[in-house]
């Protein structure tokens, strides 16, 4: 827990822990053994809708479809608590939610990425693999998160947990791209990270004069929900997909009948994510003040009513993690999280404290970020645990001590733990920093006068246009404290800045957030003749 009194004059408390007192598999400084890839694990056969492959050809598929480990590699019991290094509760809460994301954890523990990673510098996937491995194999203990996880983001004060969450997910997505830096945007949406967290929006405009239809498709990694007028997540989702009427001054300039005509604008989910991240917009864009209201969220959520394709049966998601902010502003207070362990028990993860709790307690929080997983995926992972498929069965002795360095080397031979490399600590961050990450986000903000659903140009009848979204190119002034990072370590490479467009992201003006409920970071254009 932490508040303004813990800012310690902006001091970054990782500085006091630069020399580790116990061995850990810190992937930021680990030398990854380049070994052959193990046999491919069985792939999931269930899919909802092809991930926009019907929209445009994919020049290069970076990961086979549904390439997610089917059998669980996670220990059934809850893992370690995380040490607060000084105003890092936002980081700890976010990491715990990611650690207990079943498909991500299973992929990390499979070691598939680190065995073939070609990045010469810090890699976020390797760093997260080391963290998740260490956390899940250290029940009953407290571990220290790697400095590299916050490099380029932490500025010595409390940050926004959702921003850090998407910063990390984006960095992992970028880490899937080495060797494919010139891939098109369609191919970038085939990474394993996108297959776990990603889906696709469909924005459909129907001209009420000529009945022409314009469809715009955009990938997403999380969904932001406006809760100003909503009392529940269900109500917020209903508001998000409610058809919008375009008439009068907002009449639609139809590219088919070449008239400004009344139209209906409908937003739906074209493809569903395996893991659904729902962000409740609790903070005021201008002041940062918190909207402290109770918003009901269910343990099971049916997303079928919000899909483009109807009458295909329920699409049920189950809750497995909740990220909570306690306080009255995004500038103070503290973060903690609730996670569901593999055996089904819920735990409150409050920095170093790990406490078992009931689902009633979980559902009574003023949640900030909700994590859902498709029910079929959760059941698949749970069944594999009950069959004892994890690589190492944690016995009674595992609850009394953390995994040793030797055990981790035995179970995860791709990780080695040399001493801290001083030149890594002193290296200038030519890689991605928070400012670098936010720059393309500002470029991608939509112009106020631009309608993303507008079909431009004169086209023949019976034409479906999937057009390229347009964005604002300006960038707001940086805050002085954002000009440099207090950590000179960085966890990812900053080349190919275009690929760093994910989620509902903060601008450089404090904690401002996109007013739209969906994420716009695609650049795709396709003309389909019916």
Curated annotation (Swiss-Prot):
Biased composition (Polar residues): 495-510
Keyword vocabulary terms for this entry: Endoplasmic reticulum, Nucleus
This protein's record includes keyword Endoplasmic reticulum: yes
GO terms assigned for molecular function: cysteine-type deubiquitinase activity
Annotated Basic and acidic residues bias: 382-392
GO biological processes: protein deubiquitination; regulation of apoptotic process; regulation of protein stability
InterPro entries reported in the protein's UniProt record: Papain-like_cys_pep_sf (IPR038765), Peptidase_C19 (IPR050164), Peptidase_C19_UCH (IPR001394), USP_CS (IPR018200), USP_dom (IPR028889)
GO CC annotation: cytosol; endoplasmic reticulum; nucleus
Matching Pfam families: UCH (PF00443)
Family named by the database record: Belongs to the peptidase C19 family. USP17 subfamily.
Name this protein carries in UniProt: Inactive ubiquitin carboxyl-terminal hydrolase 17-like protein 8
């Amino acid at each position: 827990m932490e508040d303004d009194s813990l800012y310690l004059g902006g001091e970054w408390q990782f500085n006091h822990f630069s020399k580790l007192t116990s061995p850990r598999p810190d992937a930021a400084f680990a030398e990854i053994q380049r070994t052959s890839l193990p046999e491919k694990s069985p792939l999931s056969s269930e899919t909802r809708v092809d991930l926009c492959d019907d929209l445009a050809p994919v020049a290069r598929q970076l990961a086979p479809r549904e390439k997610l480990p089917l059998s669980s590699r996670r220990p059934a019991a809850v893992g370690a608590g995380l040490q607060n290094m000084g105003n890092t509760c936002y980081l700890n809460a976010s990491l715990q939610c990611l650690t207990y994301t079943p498909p991500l954890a299973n992929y990390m523990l499979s070691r598939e990425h680190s065995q073939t990673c070609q990045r010469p510098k810090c890699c976020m996937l390797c760093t997260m693999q080391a963290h998740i491995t260490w956390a899940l194999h250290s029940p009953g203990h407290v571990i220290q998160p790697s400095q590299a996880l916050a490099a380029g983001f932490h500025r010595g004060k409390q940050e926004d947990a959702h921003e850090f969450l998407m910063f990390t997910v984006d960095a992992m997505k970028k880490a899937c791209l080495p060797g494919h830096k010139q891939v098109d945007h369609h191919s970038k949406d085939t990474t394993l990270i996108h297959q776990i967290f990603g889906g696709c929006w469909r924005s459909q405009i129907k001209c009420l004069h000529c009945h022409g239809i314009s469809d715009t498709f955009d990938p997403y990694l999380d969904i932001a929900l406006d809760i100003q007028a909503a009392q529940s997540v269900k109500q917020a989702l209903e508001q998000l997909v409610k058809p919008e009427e375009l008439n009068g001054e907002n009449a639609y300039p139809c590219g088919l009948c070449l008239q400004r005509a009344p139209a209906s604008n409908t937003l739906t989910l074209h493809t569903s994510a395996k893991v659904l991240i729902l962000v409740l917009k609790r903070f005021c864009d201008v002041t940062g003040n918190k909207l402290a209201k109770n918003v009901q969220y269910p343990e099971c959520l049916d997303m079928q009513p919000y899909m483009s394709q109807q009458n295909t049966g329920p699409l049920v998601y189950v809750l497995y993690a909740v990220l909570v902010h306690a306080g009255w502003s995004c500038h103070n207070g503290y973060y903690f999280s609730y996670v569901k362990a593999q055996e089904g028990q819920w735990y409150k993860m409050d920095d170093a404290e790990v406490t078992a709790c009931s689902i009633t307690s979980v559902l009574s929080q003023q949640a900030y970020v909700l994590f859902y997983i498709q029910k079929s995926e959760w059941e698949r992972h749970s069944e594999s645990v009950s069959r004892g498929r994890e690589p190492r069965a944690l016995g009674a002795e595992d609850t009394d001590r953390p995994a040793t360095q030797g055990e981790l080397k035995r179970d995860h031979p791709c990780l080695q733990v040399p001493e801290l490399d001083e030149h890594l600590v002193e290296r200038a961050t030519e890689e991605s920093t928070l400012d670098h990450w936010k720059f393309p986000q500002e470029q991608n903000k939509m112009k106020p006068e631009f309608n993303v659903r507008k079909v431009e140009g004169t086209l023949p009848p019976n034409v479906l246009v999937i057009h390229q979204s347009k964005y604002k190119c300006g960038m707001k002034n940086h805050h002085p404290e954002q000009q440099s990072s207090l950590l000179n370590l960085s966890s990812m490479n900053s080349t190919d800045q275009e690929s760093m467009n994910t989620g509902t992201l903060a601008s450089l003006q404090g904690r401002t957030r996109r007013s739209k409920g969906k994420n716009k970071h695609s650049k795709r254009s396709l003309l389909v003749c019916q």
